[in-house]
């Protein structure tokens, strides 16, 4: 071994280190979370939301994507939203629990406004982890 390299057949070859990223889609989300979301909306005079398969798939894809890239963003939302009927998206990072993510969104003016949109009737919610952090995605739609 020579510094950060290995000697192979008289030649010094750099040692390659590979980072393997594991992304786990976390089983999400409990009925309690939907109850919390709907209670929040109903307290503001809005109808309850129902879970949507297409919005759930969209939220799952984006949660996995954020975890794989270790980046919280809205990448892809605007190009995908029409096909799934999505109207708004909330993302979060750093919350270990569903209730933490909801509290974070309720405490943020823009995210709160999304949760109180009067023209949405359905949602998809997913969470994914990269081994260190957990990423959340809530997609709201008609």
Regions found by a protein language model. Name each.
Residues 20-28:
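Bacterial N-terminal signal peptides
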Residues 43, 84, 119-120:
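A short, amphipathic edge element
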Residues 39, 95-142:
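Disulfide-stabilized extracellular recognition modules
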Residues 54-101, 115:
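Short, surface-exposed glycine/acidic/tryptophan-bearing loops
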Residues 1-12:
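Short, Lys/Arg-enriched N-terminal segments with co-localized hydrophobic residues
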Residues 48-49, 73, 122:
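Residue-level detector of short coil/turn "hinge" positions at structural boundaries
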Residues 13-17:
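Positively charged n-region of N-terminal signal peptides that target proteins for export
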Residues 30-67:
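A short alpha-helix/helix-coil micro-patch that ends at or immediately precedes a cysteine
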């Amino acid at each position: 071994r020579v510094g950060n390299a290995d000697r192979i057949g008289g030649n010094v070859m750099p040692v390659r280190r590979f980072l393997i990223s594991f992304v786990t889609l976390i089983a999400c989300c409990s009925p309690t979370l939907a109850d919390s979301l709907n209670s929040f909306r109903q307290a503001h005079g809005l109808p309850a939301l129902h879970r949507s398969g297409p919005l759930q798939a969209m939220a799952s894809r984006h949660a996995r994507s954020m975890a794989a890239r270790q980046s919280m963003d809205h990448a892809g939302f605007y190009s995908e939203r029409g096909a799934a009927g999505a109207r708004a998206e909330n993302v979060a990072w750093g919350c270990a629990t569903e209730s933490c993510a909801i509290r974070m969104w309720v405490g943020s003016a823009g995210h709160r406004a999304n949760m109180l949109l009067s023209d949405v009737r359905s949602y998809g919610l997913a969470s994914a982890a990269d081994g260190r952090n957990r990423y959340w995605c809530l997609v709201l739609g008609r």
